């Protein structure tokens, strides 16, 4: 009986695909807020893109010339990094074209406007044609096909990057939560209510722990998951499917 329960749960979560003999209708008509998506951070970017991840988070720092660089490890040592421009080129080459949107989360670990302006410059000279403006939460997954959705925080304000950002976790429509906050919220009902209409992104803690999925990161409706959970797989899954 227990194996059947496990299989049923995995199928409901979208982790088991029907056999080739069945015709599966993928509902792409619902708003973005109604889809779960697994993401990747601090993983080799090209590897993550080749796996098909449509949510990538990059941690951006300033180098000695105030150019934007992306940390390759959680506890950045000022050594292991790559240029932000090279990341943009890889995203351009590997993430598009696609039937799915691509969500790029940028965490700026600098208050230097020059660096943020250079981030905007590299985005504009690589993936600009895939970017969009305006609200995205209520748009259907299908209408966002092949688009780049940019999310970031307060550090983008007052820079050339700000008008490129679709969602900020410092505004009321997006929340940035740690794994602990998402799975053990202080106000569970309030979080469930929030995620019915808005988006929550779940990120690893500072120790970048490896999770065994003992707790359901999606339990209170949090849609975007950057925690390296074993059951995580690329793509968008309708949360009521």
Please give the residue ranges for each predicted region.
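Long, acidic (Asp/Glu-rich), low-complexity accessory segments flanking structured domains
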Residues: 1-55, 62-241
């Amino acid at each position: 009986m227990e194996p059947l329960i496990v299989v049923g749960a995995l199928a409901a979560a979208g982790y088991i695909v029907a056999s080739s003999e069945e015709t599966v209708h993928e509902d792409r008509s619902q708003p973005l807020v109604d889809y779960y998506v697994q993401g990747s951070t601090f993983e080799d970017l090209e590897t993550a893109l080749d796996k098909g991840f449509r949510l990538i988070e990059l941690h951006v720092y300033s180098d000695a010339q105030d150019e934007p660089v992306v940390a390759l490890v959680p506890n950045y040592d000022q050594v292991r990094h790559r240029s932000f421009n090279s990341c943009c080129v890889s995203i351009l080459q590997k993430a598009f074209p696609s039937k799915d949107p691509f969500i790029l989360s940028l965490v700026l670990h600098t208050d230097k406007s020059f660096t943020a302006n250079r981030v905007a410059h590299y985005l504009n000279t690589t993936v600009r044609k895939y970017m969009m403006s305006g609200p995205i939460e209520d748009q259907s997954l299908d209408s966002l096909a092949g688009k780049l959705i940019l999310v970031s925080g307060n550090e983008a304000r007052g820079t050339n990057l700000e008008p490129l950002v679709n969602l900020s976790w410092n505004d009321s429509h997006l929340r940035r939560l740690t794994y602990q906050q998402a799975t053990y919220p202080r106000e569970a009902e309030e979080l469930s209510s929030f995620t019915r209409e808005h988006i929550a992104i779940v990120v690893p803690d500072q120790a970048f722990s490896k999770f065994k999925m003992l707790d359901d990161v999606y339990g209170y409706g949090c849609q975007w998951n950057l925690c390296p959970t074993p059951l995580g797989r690329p793509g968008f899954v309708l949360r009521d499917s």
